Amino acid sequence: PISVGHNVTIHGATVKDYALIGMGSTILDHAVIGEGAIVAAGSLVLSNTVIEPGSIWGGVPAKFIKKVDPEQAKELNQKIAHNYLMYSQWYK
C-alpha cells in the first residue's frame, strides 16, 4: 500500500510499497519512488529521478532531505491509511 495526498499528479512513475506522496505533489515520467520514501507536500519530482528507499525528498525541484527509519515510514503510512478508512465511515 501507498499513501497519496490530495491533488497529487503521478505521471508515468513507479511508486513502491509504503511510500507517502504529500498533498499537491507532482511526480513526472519515469521517476521511481522507493519503498518507504516520503515526498514532501507541494514537491516536484522531475523525470527520471530515483528516490532511494527510506528517504525524504522535498522542494521544487525535489531534492534529498534526509534518511528515515524504514519502520517509521511504514508505520506512518499505515496510520494514514487507517485514518482515511475511519474518515470514510463518517460519510456513509
Language-model segments: residues:
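Short proline/glycine- and basic residue-enriched helix-capping loop/turn segments at helix->loop/beta transitions
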Residues: 3
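Glycine-rich hexapeptide-repeat left-handed beta-helix
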Residues: 6, 11-16, 20-92
